[in-house]
Amino acid sequence: MAIKDLDFSDILDVSALKRDCDVIFKEDSKRIADIKSDLLPIFRRASTEGREKARELLKADGSGIDCARRISWLQDRLIETLYDLACQHVYPKDAPQIAVAAVGGYGRGTLAPGSDIDLLFLLPAKNTPDMHKAVEFVLYLLWDLGFKVGHATRTVDECIRLSKSDMTIRTAILEVRAICGRKSLTDDLEKRFESEVVTGTGPEFIAAKLAERDQRHRKAGDTRYLVEPNVKEGKGGLRDLHTLFWIAKYYYHVRDTADLVKLGVLSRSELKLFEKADDFLWAVRCQMHFITGKAEERLSFDIQREIADALNYQPRPGLSAVERFMKHYFLVAKDVGDLTRIVCAALEDRQAKDVPGLSGVLSRFAHRVRKIPGSVEFVEDRGRIALARPDVFKNDPVNLIRLFHIADINNLELHPDALRVVTRSLSLINDELRENEEANRLFLSILTSRRDPALTLRRMNEAGVLGKFIPEFGKIVAMMQFNMYHHYTVDEHLIRSVGVLSEVDKGTAVDAHPLANQLMPGVEEREALYVAVLLHDVAKGRQEDHSIAGARVARKLCQRFRLTGKQTETVVWLIEQHLLMSMVAQTRDLHDRKTITDFADKVQSMERLKMLLILTVCDIRAVGPGVWNGWKGQLLRSLYYETELLLSGGFSEVSRKERAQIARQALYDALEDWGQKARRKYTKLHYEPYLLTVALEDQVRHTRFMREADKQEKALSTMVRTHSFHAITEITVLAPDHPRLLSIITGACAAAGANIADAQIFTTSDGRALDTILINREFPIDEDETRRGANVGKLIEEVLSGKQRLPEMIATRTKSRRKKSAFTIPPSVTISNGLSNKFTVIEVECLDRPGLLADMTAVIADLSLDIHSARITTFGEKVIDTFYVTDLFGQKVTNDNRQASIAQRLKAVMSEQEDELRDRMPNGIIAHPDVAALPAARTAKA
């Protein structure tokens, strides 16, 4: 159906619009400028009301494609009316000689509420200045109405010439559509474009469009499972669907997607899949534009919940409404990938047949298929595995698994035609195949491959095989978790986890994960570890704890995979405890003996400890870019070594002292360019926790930093370093210790707009604090980030020395940055005396915000508590901070009423009800002559 044949008059009364315009032109004395001024409110009202009506109808019927067509129709009528006015009243002689056409996406008859309007003004070969003025009349009014108009004014000859050399222009003209004006010009352009540009250039166009698609994917994020996807440009988004249609239209000369069924390119069910995907993606995109009031293409967390509500998604047990919506989105993105493979396979087959004469014979001879050793079911076609016969899966469904296994061991790509048949054969994967011993043996071989198991698993997942073969995995395919911590869907996270394990297994991750690489060759149950890594989050999205439910799921699957009883118990334990090591390392004081003994009681064996460390590394690394950093690696290594000593019978305070002495000696030796007196002085400054936790390279850096500060007689100094691992900048602060030091440092970071990812708190034997703050990186270039870090360090120094007033800075800088969060996390405070023999442990969990850590540490100081150590941990938008505290007498807080008061005050801060605490922050507490007399906030061994 032609666009003009559609009737969307329920969103615009065209006759009424024209009558309102005619009234303005009845006054002959008006100048053009005055006429334009009078027309603007009329057209602005028509556009606004029409779009609002389109939004109401989208809410009512849910059809995204109809909404996009309504807005396109509305835009057509506005442009047509403006053009008619130019013809009738402004340039009656020349305006009728031009044509106004839509091109690009608008030419297809679809338009998102905030999208650009791409117009082509066609002029006859002999044109006049007034024709150009008529174009300007329409254009200027559209611009004055606030539309973003992409436009070109050309003759047909110019269009043909330019489209031959410019692929962007060629693609735009491919979907040219007459809106109004001299239709013969548009018809002539379409005919000449087909005969002079399209004919014989199909392969060239296809190659260009696919290359353009790949480049676009790399820019937008080369996975369709990013949890904040770009709906227009991202993988599996609208542009991918449109690229498919452009290619099909160009090569097959079709006018409509339905024509691809007649040509045998798509089946009827695949056409339905195309139309459903198109409709859904348009619904999402239109809602995004309506909700944000602009051409927003990124489906960010801020708007996901609102869009889920607008599209009428409801929560289900284990999944919120927004998570159900996003799962639907990712499943649609996967469908788009399936359709891409199907069309590409058909095109390749068609192109091979279309090569004429001797060239075709030679081409087919050069590209003949080759046998694959050991396989009669599959053949090699130009480095890709292809089917030897079309019925290979029907004859033996095990071949659906064998295909990927043979591709893996022979390092072959998958032929798109083979993938098309796989997609159409998924119904063959039934319970009988799932229980088949050979199928499970092949799958386990794929999973534990020494080559690239993640690549093969991802191919299986993209083809739909993985989720069908392991239905429990199928339940988490395309599932997102509505938080800022996880960057990928659950299935993509699990596959990436296997990829990290493979890197460790092959020894290619030595620099990033030295301990994991060292331990991996000694792991006795390699198969069990791979299974545990693949399945550790398989029960996400259920009402019960996913670790417990996942262990239960894994027990059944291990039997299917024919693992031994011992292997099964190992997998079950690893999945049940897969969060344990990460949480202990990041939220507990690793120098508190009870932390280690409690952890060792749960682990019980060295083999489990090795495997749990490796699983933890894989899990954190696969969460997303910037989540893993060197500090987390150091925490995990410290926990491993402490637990190893205990499990092997070597854990004692003596051994800790010996190890600390060895570390002290290593620092002494590393300062070989210093004199002995200076080496002895500075190596004696540090206590055991520092020596056993901080890497030697950092100890050397800190010691040189301290000596330089002493030479310059600086009581206060900061040092900045950007790390090679992603998204972290380190600021080290040397200052005399003080009760509110940590609060003021973190407050200064908040005032500077720096988000703290972690903090290391140490005190030296001469009463100074050596605190290292890790802040999230803001700039990609090291020089820019170093400059920014130095500015944060300078602000810390100015606040501590009294040059800047922190309360006002926090109040002005953080409040202006705050906005309503897309997330809600109920504040939680847990106070325990059972986690440490010496300290009361306060653990807080809440929504992160600028200045939160400063507020919490201020409250703790205000409550007359000493912070002996702290673990600052952020998981996306959620923060879990743990403080090891005593009262001013060095005792645990045991009084129930006092514990309740602490919890109440901290919850008030987390709910932003205690900003007045900032007013009581001291000003200039550090750089005073009598600073040494100030009370210590942290014991010497903090």
From Swiss-Prot:
Ranges for domain ACT: 730-811, 841-920
Ranges for domain HD: 490-606
Alphabetical list of PROSITE patterns matching this protein: ACT, HD
GO biological processes: regulation of nitrogen utilization
An example molecular function term from Gene Ontology annotations: phosphoric diester hydrolase activity
Known regulation of activity: Uridylyltransferase (UTase) activity is inhibited by glutamine, while glutamine activates uridylyl-removing (UR) activity.
Region (Uridylyltransferase): 1-373
Keyword rRNA processing: no
Names of the cofactor(s): Mg(2+)
Source domain of life: Bacteria
EC number: 2.7.7.59, 3.1.4.-
Region Uridylyl-removing, residue ranges: 374-729
Keywords: Hydrolase, Magnesium, Multifunctional enzyme, Nucleotidyltransferase, Repeat, Transferase
Keyword Transmembrane belongs to the record: no
Reaction(s) catalysed (UniProt annotation): [protein-PII]-L-tyrosine + UTP = [protein-PII]-uridylyl-L-tyrosine + diphosphate; [protein-PII]-uridylyl-L-tyrosine + H2O = [protein-PII]-L-tyrosine + UMP + H(+)
Entry note about domains: Has four distinct domains: an N-terminal nucleotidyltransferase (NT) domain responsible for UTase activity, a central HD domain that encodes UR activity, and two C-terminal ACT domains that seem to have a role in glutamine sensing.
Family membership noted in the UniProt record: Belongs to the GlnD family.
Alphabetized HAMAP family for the sequence: PII_uridylyl_transf
Role played: Modifies, by uridylylation and deuridylylation, the PII regulatory proteins (GlnB and homologs), in response to the nitrogen status of the cell that GlnD senses through the glutamine level. Under low glutamine levels, catalyzes the conversion of the PII proteins and UTP to PII-UMP and PPi, while under higher glutamine levels, GlnD hydrolyzes PII-UMP to PII and UMP (deuridylylation). Thus, controls uridylylation state and activity of the PII proteins, and plays an important role in the regulation of nitrogen assimilation and metabolism.
Name by which UniProt lists this protein: Bifunctional uridylyltransferase/uridylyl-removing enzyme
Organism: Agrobacterium fabrum (strain C58 / ATCC 33970)
